Design a protein with these regions (language model features):
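Short C-terminal beta-strands that terminate individual repeats in beta-propeller domains
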Residues: 37-39, 76
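Structural signal for beta-propeller blades
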Residues: 24-26, 63-66, 114-117
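Short loop/turn segments that connect beta-strands within beta-propeller blades
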Residues: 29-34, 68-72, 120-121
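Blade-level signature of beta-propeller repeat domains, shared across WD40, Kelch, NHL, RCC1
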Residues: 93-121
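Beta-rich, blade/repeat-based domains predominating
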Residues: 1-15, 21-22, 41-53, 60, ...
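Extracytoplasmic/periplasmic copper-protein system
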Residues: 78-80
Length: 121
């Protein structure tokens, strides 16, 4: 196996979670390198963050912030989507929008609006 277009990686329990923009997946990678698709069917997932076993995902093409928990996915917010294509060499919407969790808030960087969004969890 392999990744098509990995965009973000974070620690998750003893493993890693990787967002793959091209496949539309969040993939769990264990210490031995084995991969397991955790979330599928996303539209250009870029940023990922974890809080209380929930996985928060930023979709670059839609600007949606999604929450994945126990097999269920829901939209919790929408911000400006990622950057438009600037040239044939740049993939669609690919100036990264980062996610971070601090206390009971999710922070999202938005490059088109030059903003830092804060969402209460």
């Amino acid at each position: 196996d392999g990744f098509m277009a990995p965009t973000h990686v974070i620690n998750y329990e003893e493993d890693l979670l990787v967002s793959d923009r091209s496949s539309g997946q969040i993939i769990r990678v264990n210490k031995q390198g084995a991969q397991e698709v955790i979330v599928d069917g996303l539209d250009s997932p870029e940023g990922i963050a974890i809080k209380d076993n929930a996985i928060y995902i930023f979709e670059g093409n839609t600007g949606q912030i999604k929450k994945y928990l126990e097999g269920q996915i829901s939209i919790i917010a929408e911000v400006m989507p990622g950057s438009p294509v600037q040239s044939e060499l740049q993939p669609p919407s690919m100036v990264f929008n980062g996610l971070a969790v601090k206390d009971n808030y999710l922070y999202i960087s938005g490059e088109l609006e030059r903003s830092l969004f804060r969402i209460e969890l």
